[in-house]
Structures are given as structure tokens and as C-alpha cells.
Amino acid sequence: MKKINAIILLSSLTSASVFAGAYVENREAYNLASDQGEVMLRVGYNFDMGAGIMLTNTYNFQREDELKHGYNEIEGWYPLFKPTDKLTIQPGGLINDKSIGSGGAVYLDVNYKFVPWFNLTVRNRYNHNNYSSTDLSGELDNNDTYEIGTYWNFKITDKFSYTFEPHYFMRVNDFNSSNGKDHHWEITNTFRYRINEHWLPYFELRWLDRNVEPYHREQNQIRIGTKYFF
């Protein structure tokens, strides 16, 4: 398939350098507060005009524990409106399924390419659970969140790129996050190195706010993964 240059708009919208065509991805994560790990397997396809779709499957594990299924997810996006060669508006959505129930999300990305080596995406997203949970008042309700995220994408060299990714979550109903508040932050630093047209390994350092129950620690997470483009 045709290779897409890393500095064009498609890379900014997905916050990673991509090629048109199919790819597979494997990622492992470890949370220092919960001592829990995650293995992710993903397949995806990027279209020439900027749309994309991906299927994700995850498994969780802890020390001396067996591997347990996390969730299945399908996500897609489409560049709906591009008023200039620098500005793109792109909606997207996903559905997921796990042992406790199903859910989904819809989002709208607005990306602006300031210079060839820097672009910014602002994302507004609503996350919905189809199942009910017990809220702070003892009632059953949907533990939904409204999320605002930004992706600060820097192209350092032809092979090396960096993304700063802060996300702010607000509970829609009467629930608290793991920090004991009705809101929390998740901040990700992603470092990518393109070996060649096929291999793209990456390394992520994440802060997932403080956990007050049961770990009483800052939630720091490490992720290591790689993508292979066909």
C-alpha cells in the first residue's frame, strides 16, 4: 500500500505516524500501584482518506494470578470536514464488551497542524456504560464520564516522535473516581521510533491520578508496545 508521510494530518489525528493499509499491534502495560499488568492485541486498517478502524482485545494479570480477559473493543473514525489544509474535524466512536457488561463512547476530534513538526488535537468524548453500578447514594445508575483530551504531537526527527497527552475526566452521575473525587486526570507521555516502513516500537509513561482505595498510592503505569504495518 501507499506509504503516508508522518507529517501529514492523518498522523496527527491518530497521534501516531501511520501508513495506509493494515497493521497489527502488541502492547504490555504494568501499573505500579495495583501491581497489575495488561496485555493488548490489536488489528487495524487505515484508509487513504484518513478514516480508520481497529479491533482490540486485552487480558489482565497480577503476580501469581492467571491471565484474565479484560475487554473487547471496536473503534472507528472518519475525517468529516476539512475547511483548510491545516484544520480537520473528525468524529469517531467505539463499542466495547467485558465481563461486567458492555459500553461505548462517541468523540469529536479537532486537529490543527501548526508547522510540519507540530500539530495539536483536541478531543471531546462521552463514555457510557450500558450496565448499572451502585452510586454514592446507594442507588443504581450508569457510571458515565465526560472526557476532554489533548494530543500535543511533536516530530523530533524523521524517525523519532513524541506525544504529550493529558486527559480530564468528569463523572456525569453520583460517582467518584479512584482518587475519591468526581473528576480525575490521566497523563500519557509517548515516545515512538520508526525503524523502517514496517516496524514502529513505542514506550509510554503514564500517570493515572492517585488511588485512595485500596492502594493509597499514585497510579503510575509503564507501557511498551510495537506496531507492524503490512
Curated annotation (Swiss-Prot):
Protein's UniProt name: Porin OmpL
Location within or outside the cell: Cell outer membrane
Record function comment: Outer membrane channel protein that allows an efficient diffusion of low-molecular-weight solutes such as small sugars and tetraglycine. However, the specific substrate recognized by the OmpL channel is unknown.
Taxonomic source organism: Escherichia coli (strain K12)
BP-aspect Gene Ontology terms: arabinose transmembrane transport; D-glucose import; galactose transmembrane transport; monoatomic ion transport; oligosaccharide transport
Gene this protein is translated from: ompL
Record bears the keyword Ligase: no
Highest classification ranks of the organism: Bacteria, Pseudomonadati, Pseudomonadota, Gammaproteobacteria, Enterobacterales
InterPro entries (UniProt xref): Bact_OM_Channel_sf, Oligogalacturonate-sp_porin
Keyword annotations: Cell outer membrane, Ion transport, Membrane, Porin, Signal, Sugar transport, Transmembrane, Transmembrane beta strand, Transport
Origin: domain of life: Bacteria
NCBIfam families per record: PRK09980.1 (NF007434)
Molecular function GO terms recorded: porin activity
Family affiliation: Belongs to the oligogalacturonate-specific porin KdgM (TC 1.B.35) family. OmpL subfamily.
GO CC terms, sorted: cell outer membrane; pore complex
Signal peptide boundaries: 1-20
Keyword Iron: no
